[in-house]
A protein has these predicted regions:
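Membrane-interfacial loop-to-transmembrane alpha-helix junctions, especially the N-terminal start
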Residues: 33-54, 122-123, 237-243, 298-303, ...
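Active-site lumenal/periplasmic loops and adjacent helix-entry segments of GT-C-fold
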Residues: 133-250, 259-269, 274, 278
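Membrane-embedded, hydrophobic transmembrane alpha-helices
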Residues: 1-116, 355-365
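Membrane-interface alpha helices of multi-pass inner-membrane proteins
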Residues: 301-318
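Membrane-interface transmembrane helices that cradle and orient dolichyl/undecaprenyl
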Residues: 280-301
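Transmembrane signal-anchor helices characteristic of membrane glycosylation enzymes that use polyprenol
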Residues: 122-149, 248-252, 351-363
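Perimembrane helix-loop-helix junctions
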Residues: 324-349
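Membrane-embedded alpha-helical segments of multi-pass membrane proteins
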Residues: 15-19, 82-87, 215, 219, ...
């Protein structure tokens, strides 16, 4: 039974998002005929893209279900959401095989490995130090539990979705039925934890406290690894050192209960942590991908992914949508100034459309 649960977690937390990321890579390769195999995204970037689209789809499916389903909202959600995720992942894997994208991906990985910073012992040493630091963080996150009052709300909402088959229709403080909690209802991150737990046969609280940190902590570092590839493109030996610095920064950033570093390691399962440690760094990562594109015409898929990210931010927190859209427009203005192209600002604004609709719905509720 335990083996089946672990396999279920691997399926829903690794295979499905990676398959969705493959779909993005396959479509990009198909519609950019002159794309070289070296330009294909890395496997880590595809996994990140899959998670972005997975949370964006959660909002697209979950918000209407939540608004119109007073009873059986949770079961209605996973009956729609789960098949869509599986179809997208199968489509990504199938198209990659049909269009022979896998061969290009493996060729790109071999090419990038030859250009990696690990041709010297210093690179391997700092990589070992980084993995050791992350291992300590994962061990502490799995074996220790920090007290946090927000569990009385967010953790309970996740558990009530499993046990009562409703979405934000019960007050977690007294257990009574209540009108839709408009303040928190659009942020479906606790519901996602309940969804994955239900699909794997795991209690929502165990999923939130023991499993989610093992996924989101490495996922956040994966963003920094992708950022390092861009920022230190010509100084590859500094990439592992940058990751060591980020790991130490997270470990010693607990100067108050409000820092993103504190949320990152002690409240990983909460949407606010996901907003500060995944969504906002991912916005910067996507803009760095756009900034460092040598071709004048930027890949449209990056702008579409940015739009999906601004919607996915709503899964973590209603405020996160506003912050990510503000960051998108602000960096988009700098992007326009750098390249002297108004189109960049217009595309940045266009990527905020779904996020803007989210904010309008929040205000209407």
């Amino acid at each position: 039974m335990l083996v089946l649960k672990v396999l279920g977690m691997i399926w829903w937390l690794l295979v499905i998002p990676f398959g969705i990321g493959l779909l993005v890579a396959a479509l990009t390769k198909k519609f950019r005929k002159n794309q070289e195999f070296q330009e294909l995204p890395s496997m880590g970037a595809m996994l990140l893209g899959g998670y972005i689209l997975m949370f964006a789809l959660l909002e697209l499916v979950g918000i209407p279900v939540m608004l119109f389903s007073v009873y059986h909202g949770f079961s209605n959600l996973y009956k729609i959401y789960a098949p869509l995720l599986i179809l997208l992942a199968i489509a990504g894997i199938g198209l990659s095989v049909h269009w022979q994208i896998f061969q290009d991906i493996m060729a790109a990985q071999r090419f990038k490995y030859k250009e990696s910073p690990f041709d010297r012992w210093e690179g391997w040493f700092f990589l070992f130090v980084f993995l050791l630091l992350v291992g300590v963080q994962l061990y502490m996150a799995f074996t220790r539990a920090s007290f946090d009052g927000d569990d009385a709300y967010y953790g309970v909402q996740s558990l009530m979705a499993q046990q009562t088959d409703t979405l934000y229709r019960i007050n977690p403080n007294n257990g009574r039925s209540t009108p839709l909690d408009a303040r928190h209802a659009l942020a479906l991150f606790p519901i996602w934890e309940a969804f994955v737990g239900t699909m794997c046969g795991v209690h929502a609280t165990i999923m939130a406290h023991s499993v989610v940190p093992l996924v989101l902590i490495p996922l956040s570092y994966l963003i920094y690894a992708e950022i390092a590839k861009i920022v230190f493109a010509d100084r590859k030996a500094l990439r592992p050192l940058f990751l060591v610095f980020m790991a130490l920064w997270q470990m010693f950033g607990n100067v108050s209960i409000y820092t993103t570093e504190t949320f990152f390691l002690t409240r990983t399962w909460q949407g606010k942590s996901f907003a500060g440690n995944f969504v906002l760094p991912a916005v910067l990562w996507l803009f760095l991908c756009l900034f460092y594109q040598e071709k004048k015409e930027k890949p449209l898929v990056l702008w579409l992914l940015l739009g999906a990210l601004n919607l996915a931010a709503g899964a973590s927190s209603s405020l996160a949508v506003l912050l990510s859209c503000m960051l998108t427009v602000g960096v988009g203005f700098l992007f326009m100034w750098k390249e002297r192209r108004v189109q960049n600002l217009l595309l940045a604004g266009g990527s905020c459309v779904l996020g803007g609709l989210y904010v309008l719905l929040y205000l209407a509720l």
